[in-house]
Amino acid sequence: MKLAVPDLISNSYFPAIAAVELGFFKREGLDVTLELIVPIEHALAAMRDGSLEFVGCSAHLLVAGFPEWRDVKLLCAQAQGMYWFLVMRSDLGARRGDLGVVKGRRIGAAHWVAMGLRRL
């Protein structure tokens, strides 16, 4: 079986990578190998056509490859909440915990991330 992730260096996919590398799947009787497939859309297409069994990705990305969640099932979460960081210019004087500093500001985000931020 193959598990694909779109990068090997960010913390985004660490749980999936660690599960393979530290033998979690083997202990469960599964022979799973890790494969790097970039971009994520290619990994989702490979899973759709049956050439791999698992994709480690953010849950919100699945709808890009499987509209309306057809023919795909979310097995587990790699993280809770949204693991992205909101960063601001230092000259704005933002202090930890002060959400008022974002009032009236524009926040830029990639399409699928933006959908998640709106939901929050």
What are these regions (language model features)?
Residues K2-E28, W84, S90-L120:
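Bilobed "Venus flytrap"/periplasmic-binding protein-like clamshell domains
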Residues I9, L36, A77:
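Active-site nucleophile and cofactor-binding loops and adjacent substrate-binding regions
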Residues F25, K73-L74:
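Short beta-strand/turn micro-motifs at beta-sheet edges
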Residues V32, G50-E53, G104-I107:
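Short active-site oxyanion
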